[in-house]
Curated annotation (Swiss-Prot):
Classification via NCBIfam families: gatA
Family of this protein: Belongs to the amidase family. GatA subfamily.
Catalytic machinery residues: K79 (charge relay system), S154 (charge relay system), S178 (acyl-ester intermediate)
Protein's UniProt name: Glutamyl-tRNA(Gln) amidotransferase subunit A
Signal peptide: none
Gene: gatA
Any one Gene Ontology cellular component term annotated for this protein: glutamyl-tRNA(Gln) amidotransferase complex
Organism: Staphylococcus aureus (strain MRSA252)
Protein purpose: Allows the formation of correctly charged Gln-tRNA(Gln) through the transamidation of misacylated Glu-tRNA(Gln) in organisms which lack glutaminyl-tRNA synthetase. The reaction takes place in the presence of glutamine and ATP through an activated gamma-phospho-Glu-tRNA(Gln).
Length: 485
């Protein structure tokens, strides 16, 4: 197997045993990117000079047996809405084209401290608004499993790069499914941690009460290793939780005999494709064969997840994106002749169609005549959705269901139909609204396109999610498929 398809865990062993140098790993990764990414189009910017320099420094530490760090010498790709000091961060928008931050996000500080090596920044939907990575101002990423298909979104570049063997792990952000849905479409493992588990300091805000950073990998244990490295409270993020337990790997191999798993009837209902239902039902039988107890339950407010999510997320986005005014940073229109024109033209020209749609939607929902009818009501629905989950978790350890209602759709198929695009978030948005952890793992393929299985857990119980996902992965995975793509 080429180094490019090795797992994080195996690469760490090879480096620690001095069978390979960090600089050799980094060289192999850049060779893979040069060969494959002109087709996949997952990267927006590469940090090659700094990566090679860092890898050579790690070579010297390796020679001295000073290999500190949980991710010593491991290459990584980072979604382009996560601030990287000295490296362009654009959110895939014309508005931030050429913007180079002068500070580091907390997750990047943590990863640098663990001696991971930054390879580059990954494509995404503009400002994380979209489900296909087609709203990017710069390029359209394709699905490594089928180049006619979308990789999902908004973390499409993060999922595609991992599936294509261009990095062993990446970071994405998940506001309504933006890690889990592309993970499902691209056949990789994607974790959306509990809200507050990972610091959001340095994540360009979309919807602050929903956003969460998480890892994408080709296997479950790698995912747990990366989440251990980036978790923890942060004084710079008042919403980060002071939870000390960040051990996700010690019990990962423990069996799931007697584990109580809930299967909501709504998750296999209207709107979910037959091939997805079949794959999930097969996965449920696999869980039973592993000793889990799977029972049907109801999450009655699931159907209200999409409307309440889009009102809340768009409302928060309209506020968060007001900072892009053409004055302090970002795109600045040269044609404006007054302050009002500068605001109007900079924002009209700098933002794409989908971002403007959500700003309008959010501004409308927050306006004085409609606040109670839309925003306030959506927050009440959010509470009902959370209560549904709380009730189920009184008797069950984990909830299971599809990650997305279909496999990846074709490029260009849904980009001009926002309601159809939004409907793809049916099974992921409730998890964000409730602030819960959710992980997507591959559970099948249909016409060559992967199908994702989602496990949802109690707050801060990522450990159980990793345990059940790891056991399921022993029975079904795509580990032998990636290299053939």
């Amino acid at each position: 197997m080429s180094i490019r398809y090795e797992s994080v865990e195996n690469l760490l062993t090879l480096i620690k045993d001095k069978k390979i140098k960090p600089s050799d790993v980094v060289k192999d990764i850049y060779d893979a990117i040069e060969e494959t990414d002109p087709t996949i189009k997952s990267f927006l910017a590469l940090d090659k000079e700094n990566a090679i320099k860092k890898a050579q420094e790690l070579d010297e530490l390796q020679a001295k047996d000073q290999m500190d760090g949980k991710l010593f010498g491991i290459p990584m790709g980072i979604k382009d809405n996560i601030i990287t000091n000295g490296l362009e961060t654009t959110c895939a928008s014309k508005m931030l084209e050429g913007f180079v931050p002068i500070y580091e996000s907390t997750v990047m500080e943590k990863l640098h401290n663990e001696n991971a090596v930054l390879i580059g920044k990954l494509n995404m939907d503009e400002f994380a608004m979209g489900g296909s990575t087609e709203t990017s101002y710069f390029k359209k990423t394709v699905n490594p499993f089928d180049h006619k298909a979308v990789p999902g979104g908004s973390s499409g570049g993060s999922a595609a790069a991992v599936a294509a063997g261009l990095v062993p792990f990446s970071l994405g952000s998940d506001t309504g499914g933006s890690i889990r849905q592309p993970a499902a479409y691209c056949g990789v493992v994607g974790m959306k941690p509990t809200y507050g588990r990972v610091s959001r300091f340095g994540l360009v805000a979309f919807a602050s009460s929903l956003d969460q950073i998480g890892p994408l990998t080709r296997n479950v244990k790698d995912n747990a290793i990366v989440l251990e490295a980036i978790s923890g409270a942060d004084a710079n993020d008042s919403t980060s939780a002071p939870v000390d337990d960040v051990d996700f790997t010690s019990e990962i191999g423990k069996d799931i005999k007697g584990l109580k798993v809930a299967l909501p009837k709504e998750y296999l209902g209207e709107g979910v494709a037959d091939d997805v239902k079949e794959a999930v039902q097969n996965a449920v039988e696999t869980l039973k064969s592993l000793g889990a107890v799977v029972e049907e339950v109801s999450l009655p407010n699931t159907k209200f997840g999409i409307p309440s999510y889009y009102v809340i997320a768009s409302s928060e986005a309209s506020s968060n994106l007001s900072r892009f005014d053409g004055i302090r940073y970002g795109y600045h229109s040269k044609e404006a002749h007054s302050l009002e024109e500068l605001y109007k033209m900079s924002r009209s020209e700098g933002f794409g169609k989908e971002v403007k749609r959500r700003i309008f939607l959010g501004t409308f929902a927050l306006s004085s005549g409609y606040y109670d009818a839309y925003y306030k009501k959506s927050q009440k629905v959010r509470t009902l959705i959370k209560n549904d989950f709380d009730k189920v978790f009184e008797n069950y350890d984990v909830v299971v269901g599809p990650t997305a209602p279909t496999t990846a759709f074709n490029l260009g198929e849904e980009i001009d139909d926002p309601l159809t695009m939004y409907a793809n978030d049916l099974l992921t948005t409730p998890v964000n609204l409730a602030g819960l952890p959710g992980i997507s793992v591959p559970c099948g393929q249909s016409n060559g396109r992967p199908i994702g299985l989602q496990f949802i857990g109690k707050p801060f119980d990522e450990k159980t999610l990793y345990r059940v996902a790891y056991q399921y992965e022993t029975q079904y995975n795509l580990h032998d498929v990636y290299e053939k793509l």
